[in-house]
């Protein structure tokens, strides 16, 4: 998925609004995904999946950090997330569809917290960005 210059600007703009809330939004995204797509819980059998659990917050922080890293290296998302791609493909073996679920839930969280910022154009750009991140994370699957 190729991001245009306008897409990159839109994505960076949204993430500038997210600012210090990235970790909170990461955890909220995971909670939403676990409820909306309960099959995703199978990758976290050892987690306390209750609202506000320390484990969800910690993993949400990792998700947020990866997304921020991708935004900061939007011209080389594959390079920025290479180690994470290896982890998901070779060790964790996460079903690729789960990245689509995560992306959708992240869009919902952004829409809840920043409804005015999520214009149709920004929505499309953020969706393309999340698809690009998902594509990178599944690129090394065999």
Swiss-Prot record:
Report the coiled-coil segments.
none
Q: Which Pfam families match?
A: Globin
Q: In which tissues is it expressed?
A: Red blood cells.
Signal peptide (from-to) = none
Q: Which GO terms describe its biological process?
A: hydrogen peroxide catabolic process
Tell me the subunit arrangement: Heterotetramer of two alpha chains and two beta chains.
- Keyword vocabulary terms for this entry: Heme, Iron, Metal-binding, Oxygen transport, Transport
Question: What range(s) does the Globin domain occupy?
Answer: 2-142
What SUPFAM superfamilies is this protein classified in?
Globin-like
Q: InterPro entries from the entry?
A: Globin, Globin-like_sf, Globin/Proto, Hemoglobin_a-typ, Hemoglobin_oxygen_transport, Hemoglobin_pi
Q: What is this protein called?
A: Hemoglobin subunit alpha-A
Q: Which family does it belong to?
A: Belongs to the globin family.
Q: Does the keyword Transport apply?
A: yes
Q: Which residues bind O2?
A: 59
Where along this sequence does the record place binding of heme b? 88
Q: Which GO terms describe its molecular function?
A: haptoglobin binding; heme binding; iron ion binding; organic acid binding; oxygen binding; oxygen carrier activity; peroxidase activity
A GO cellular component annotation here is: hemoglobin complex
The record's function comment reads: Involved in oxygen transport from the lung to the various peripheral tissues.
